[in-house]
Amino acid sequence: MARQKFDGNKPHVNIGTIGHVDHGKTTLTAAITTALASQGKGKARKYDEIDAAPEEKARGITINTAHVEYETEKRHYAHVDCPGHADYVKNMITGAAQMDGAILVVSAADGPMPQTREHILLAKQVGVPNMVVFLNKEDQIDDADLLELVELEVRELLSKYDFPGDQIPFVSGSALLALESLSSNPKLMRGEDKWVDKILALMDAVDEYIPTPERPIDKSFLMAIEDVFSITGRGTVATGRIERGAIKVGETVELVGLKDTKSTTVTGLEMFQKTLEEGMAGDNIGILLRGVQKTDIERGMVLAKPGSITPHTQFESEVYVLTKDEGGRHTPFFSGYRPQFYVRTTDVTGSIDAFTADDGSNAEMVMPGDRIKMTVSLVHPIAIEQGMRFAIREGGRTIGAGVVSKILK
C-alpha cells in the first residue's frame, strides 16, 4: 500500500492527548483520525492499533508511545498517545515526543481526577505551552448543569497551575459514540452526525487556539560542541549538530559554558569535507573560528548567537528517577547526592540540594520510580535555559531524566 502523502505546505504541529487513565484518551485519538479520514484528511486508526504502542528509547529510558498523523484544512498534525500513566511522565520529562500543545481529556461523568491534575502540572513544568479540553463521555450525563460544574472544576484546576483557565476552549462530546457512528458509516460528512461534529469542533478549536510553533530554523542559533581540533594554518574547528537557527560565514558567535564567555567570528563552515556558506538546524557541521585556540574549547560548551543563552550553575527541575527494572538505582538517594548531569554533549558533576513534592512540601528521600522536583547545583557553569532536557548519570549509566523548570543562578 502506498504511503499517503501529506501536503508539505501546511504548517506542522505536534500534539498529544493527556489526562487520567480510562477517561478516553486513546478512544479520542482513534475518533479524531477516523473523523478526519472521513473528510479525506489522513488514515483512520483503530483503538487497538493505537493502544498497542511500540516501545522506544529516549535518553536511555524505554517509553511506550503511539504516534499517529492526520491533517485538518489548516494544518498537519503529529499526535502522540501513551498507554500508561508512567509513559506520560517519562515522555513529557524526556521530551521524547515534543508537544506544541495538548488535548486534555476529562471524563464528564467523573470530573478531574489525580492524574488530570498531575498531567496539567507536568505540562506546565515541562513547557507544553497551550491546551484545549475535551469533556468526554457526555452521553453519560443527563443534566447539563453537571457538565457545567465539571467544566468549572477543570477551569479552576488549569488556572491553579498558571494556564489561562478562563480562555482555554472546551468541547464536550463522546469519542466512543463518534467512533460507532463512523464505523457504521465511514463517509459521514460535517453536519450529518452530532457526535462526529463534536470531534470536528474539537479539531477546529485546536486549529484556532494552539499556535503554530516557531520552526527550529527561525530560532536563535545554537550548537552544542561535540569535538574540537586545529587545522594547521587555518585555525580551530568546533564540530557538532546545529540544534536551532542558522549560521553564516562572517557572523559573530559566543562560546558559552565551562569557562568565561568568549566572542569569536565564524571564518568557515564545512560539512562532509565540503565548504558551505550557511549551516542550518539539523546539520552536522564543522565551524572554523577566528582567534580561538584549541585549548579554549571543550566538549560541552555551546556556540550561540551573542546574548541568546547564558551560563548558569543552579536550577530547579522536574525529574523522573528510573526503576531498578529500567536499569536505574536499586536504592533511594537523599539530598546532598552528587551524580553527573549529562547536558547536551557532556557530563557535569552537580549536587542535589533539595527535593520538593507536588504539594510543595520537602521530601527527605527519592525512591527509584519517583517523579520529583529537585534543586540542582553544578560545579561548573554551563549554558542552560528553561525547558532544557538532561539525564542524571552515575558511573556512566542513566539513573534519571529531567527538564529545567526554573533557573536560579
Curated annotation (Swiss-Prot):
Residues 136-139 are annotated as: G4. It comes from the Eukaryota. Residues 174-176 are annotated as: G5. InterPro entries: EF-Tu_GTP-bd, EF-Tu_GTPase, EFTu-like_2, EFTU_2, G_TR_CS, P-loop_NTPase, Small_GTP-bd, T_Tr_GTP-bd_dom. Residues 60-64 are annotated as: G2. Residues 19-26 are annotated as: G1. Belongs to the TRAFAC class translation factor GTPase superfamily. Classic translation factor GTPase family. EF-Tu/EF-1A subfamily. GTP hydrolase that promotes the GTP-dependent binding of aminoacyl-tRNA to the A-site of ribosomes during protein biosynthesis. This is Elongation factor Tu, cyanelle. It comes from Cyanophora paradoxa.
